[in-house]
Curated annotation (Swiss-Prot):
Complexes and interactors: Homooligomer. Homomultimerization via the coiled coil domain is a prerequisite for binding to L. Found in a trimeric complex in which VP35 bridges L and the nucleoprotein. Interacts with NP. Disrupts innate immune signaling in infected host cell.
Domain VP35 IID: 204-329
Lineage: Viruses, Riboviria, Orthornavirae, Negarnaviricota, Haploviricotina
Primary location class: virion
Protein name as catalogued: Polymerase cofactor VP35
Coiled coil ranges: 70-120
Gene this protein is translated from: VP35
Protein source organism: Lake Victoria marburgvirus (strain Angola/2005) (MARV)
Length: 329
């Protein structure tokens, strides 16, 4: 039977919060009325060992995954930082490459101008070499020159005002009798007497002296006292003796304008220029072969039976002991 008064007290206690729920369930009055059904056996429900092992392995896998994720996150942080640095560096490199390309576009006309200036410089050097040996005046062809000589003959001294034709007066003073002239004045007079007469042939192909021609060739050769310097001296002397120094110089510049270097030009001219064909190389007497320029010592060979310049034999060195060696290019 239900106890209505007890249930009313319990309900009021539950509604008002005076009676805890656990206390109500712990003192259940209906426990004596109903027989509680107990499970078979004294042990409660338990999981099988297989299920327990599976649950345990699953927990381990989840934990391992968490550890791996954390490790990967820690590794990816510096990688991301390095990638960002690489991207910034690449952007800087790209900017610099674009700047270099822009500068190259600006330098291209300068390079073309450099080639033009090189060609102009080559032409000017040839023109100046010819101009040094041209005739400035071929005699008393102007009134100032005649007046200068007349004043000099009458008074014995040059006129007080600046004279245009001082070299002509120097020549007159050097040739006058009873006067003492310095060496520099004598040299100036000798140069005036050796000036070529101006003509079409001498203008285009001046007959340079062997020394001047060799010095002109030396400006195109690298180094000092090389076999090509000796070859330039030998060819200059032979060309001067044959009266073809101007033609030889023109042929030399022509080969240079084709893109060849000075060594190749001299070698080619020694084999093709008509003034050198079949010419025997000169003999140079030395104390011993140690006095031969050091760059030439490695090019000394035994003298062949019939050496000629067009076959590459530059000169023959003869020592005081009677030994001979030929310089070969």
């Amino acid at each position: 039977m239900w106890d209505s008064s007890y249930m009313q007290q319990v309900s009021e206690g539950l509604m008002t919060g005076k009676v805890p729920i656990d206390q109500v369930f712990g003192t259940n009055p209906l426990e004596k009325l109903y027989k509680r059904r107990k499970p078979k056996g004294t042990v409660g429900l338990q999981c099988s060992p297989c299920l327990m092992s599976k649950a345990t392995s699953t927990d381990d896998i989840i934990w391992d995954q968490l550890v791996v994720r954390k490790t990967l996150a820690d590794l990816l942080i510096p990688i991301n930082r390095q990638i960002s640095d690489i991207q910034s560096t690449l952007s800087e490199v790209t900017t610099r490459v674009h700047e270099i390309e822009r500068q190259l576009h600006e330098i291209t006309p300068v390079l073309k101008m450099g080639r033009t200036l090189e060609a102009i410089s080559k032409g000017m050097s040839e023109m100046l070499a010819k101009y040094d040996h041209l005739v400035i005046s071929t005699g008393r062809t102007t009134a100032p020159a005649a007046a200068f000589d007349a004043y000099l003959n009458e008074h014995g001294v040059p006129p007080p005002q600046p004279a245009i034709f001082k070299d002509l007066g120097v020549a007159q003073q050097a040739c006058s009798k009873g006067t003492t002239v310095k060496n520099a004045t004598t040299d100036a007079a000798d140069k005036m007497s050796k000036v070529l007469e101006l003509s079409e042939e001498t203008f285009s192909k001046p007959n340079l002296s062997a020394k001047d021609l060799a010095l002109l060739l030396f400006t195109h050769l690298p180094g000092n006292n090389t076999p090509f310097h000796i070859l330039a001296q030998v060819l200059s002397k032979i060309a001067y003796k044959s009266g073809k120094s101007g033609a030889f110089l023109d042929a030399f510049h022509q080969i240079l304008s084709e893109g060849e270097n000075a060594q190749a030009a001299l070698t080619r001219l020694s084999r093709t220029f008509d003034a050198f064909l079949g010419v025997v190389p000169p003999v140079i007497r030395v104390k011993n072969f140690q006095t031969v320029p050091r760059p030439c010592q490695k090019s000394l060979r035994a003298v062949p039976p019939n050496p000629t310049i067009d076959k590459g034999w530059v000169c023959v060195y003869s020592s005081e002991q009677g030994e001979t060696r030929a310089l070969k290019i």
